[in-house]
């Protein structure tokens, strides 16, 4: 294995917190493979680059010679992770968990090394748990400690309901670490309480406590909100190569270094060089996005696919060409009492926007074109004739043909 300091340089790159860092150093000094834990409740069958951030870090651990345990929350998903929530999360059924987990693991293995990955389901030890064991675990935690969590504290002080079963979630996640004897547990920066609970429980059970390592939440392509399907700012791991490349090209310049560090396969030295280029003003954002797009497409679709996607992008957008596969829609163009059509509703119907709110934001930002002509900002209503057999476009990747 590499010297401890060289391993730490890789491990700490892009992380938010490592608690405690000295403890991680001591574990690495043993010069034996560590067991790196990531627990996931597969609430959705499809992953995006935001989900891939901790998986990429786990792959770095694997490349350093360590092992990974991926815990599928077949037990905890029946409760629903309350982290970062202002209301009770609807629990998943066992059938939903199983179906989503299969797709999740298949996509995760595009990133992880299967030879160094163990996949387990925490339902295997949670579901058979008897009352005596459950009460013993719950006695290790106090309500006062649980209410230290920001999300629970906010809900409590705002008099929003907190179901009793939600208190159990961090207890069971902590118990997962005991069962698999985790050396390091990873999660998003909204998971720090749960990760530290695992440390405490392991210590109470006379085990060497795990290290808590958190990763930042990836900002979406809009450069403001976290990446999420609900915000329409995501890059899916199963997106077609051309779509994936086009979405990378649409990210805002200021988040390019973050995307390189959290989503690419570049070395630490290469990442540091990109950071310096932004600091000293020598960066070429356009070329950096092209290289990033190639790298990400190659990672998820195979070597050489990035260049093909770049060529398709150049042919389409440099020459202002309309894609060959624009989806066609037949919709009703019913005017209101003023003889006008509310455009945001149409944009949702043709799948250019996921909601009226997103459609209005696209219009406000000047991001909509009709027949390849920019729509003036704040233009929410248009005459029916404007939309007859119109070609609608949002940015560089969303198109719709009305017929």
Where are these regions (language model features)?
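N-terminal catalytic cores of NTP/NDP-binding nucleotidyl/phosphoryl-transfer enzymes
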Residues: 18-82, 184-192, 198
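Short, hydrophobic/aliphatic alpha-helical segments
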Residues: 31-39, 61, 68, 169-179, ...
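Conserved nucleotide- and phosphate/pyrophosphate-binding catalytic cores
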Residues: 202-403
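Beta-lactamase-like hydrolase cores
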Residues: 1-28
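Well-ordered mid-protein domain cores that form the structural environment of catalytic cofactors
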Residues: 59-112
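Divalent-metal (Mg2+/Mn2+/Ca2+)-assisted nucleotide/phosphate chemistry catalytic cores
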Residues: 15, 91-94, 98-214, 223
């Amino acid at each position: 294995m590499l010297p401890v300091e060289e391993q730490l340089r890789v491990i700490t790159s892009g992380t938010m917190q490592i608690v405690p860092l000295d403890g991680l150093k001591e574990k690495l000094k043993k010069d034996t493979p560590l067991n790196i834990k990531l627990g996931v409740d597969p609430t959705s069958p499809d992953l995006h680059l935001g989900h891939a951030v901790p998986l990429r870090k786990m792959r770095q651990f694997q490349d350093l010679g360590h092992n990974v345990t991926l815990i599928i929350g077949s037990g905890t998903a029946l409760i629903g992770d309350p982290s970062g929530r202002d209301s009770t999360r609807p629990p998943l059924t066992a059938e939903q968990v199983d179906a989503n987990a299969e797709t999740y693991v298949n996509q995760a293995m595009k990133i992880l090394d299967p030879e160094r990955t163990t996949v387990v389901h925490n339902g295997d030890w949670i579901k058979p748990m008897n009352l005596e064991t459950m009460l013993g675990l719950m006695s290790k935690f106090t309500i006062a400690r649980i209410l230290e969590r920001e999300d629970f504290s906010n809900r409590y002080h705002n008099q929003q309901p907190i179901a009793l079963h939600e208190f159990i979630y961090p207890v069971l996640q902590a118990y997962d670490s005991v069962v698999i004897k985790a050396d390091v547990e990873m999660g998003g920066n909204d998971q720090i309480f749960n990760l530290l609970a695992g440390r405490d429980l392991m210590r109470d059970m006379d085990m060497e406590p795990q290290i808590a390592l958190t990763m930042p939440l990836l900002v979406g392509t809009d450069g403001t909100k976290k990446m999420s399907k609900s915000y329409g700012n995501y890059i899916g791991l199963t997106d077609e190569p051309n779509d994936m490349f086009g979405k990378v090209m649409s990210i805002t310049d200021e988040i390019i270094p973050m995307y390189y560090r959290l989503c690419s396969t570049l070395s630490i030295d290469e990442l540091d060089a990109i950071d310096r280029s932004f600091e000293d003003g020598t960066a070429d954002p356009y070329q950096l996005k092209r290289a990033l797009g190639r790298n990400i497409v190659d990672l998820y679709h195979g070597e050489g696919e990035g260049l093909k996607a770049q060529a398709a992008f150049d042919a389409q957008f440099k020459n202002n060409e309309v894609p060959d596969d624009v989806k066609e829609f037949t919709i009703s163009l019913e005017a209101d009492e003023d003889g006008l059509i509310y455009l945001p509703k149409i944009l949702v119907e043709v799948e250019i926007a996921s909601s009226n709110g997103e459609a209005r934001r696209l219009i406000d930002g000047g991001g909509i074109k009709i027949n390849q002509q920019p729509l003036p900002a704040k233009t929410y209503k248009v005459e029916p004739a404007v939309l007859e057999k119109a070609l609608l476009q949002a940015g560089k990747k969303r198109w719709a043909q009305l017929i």
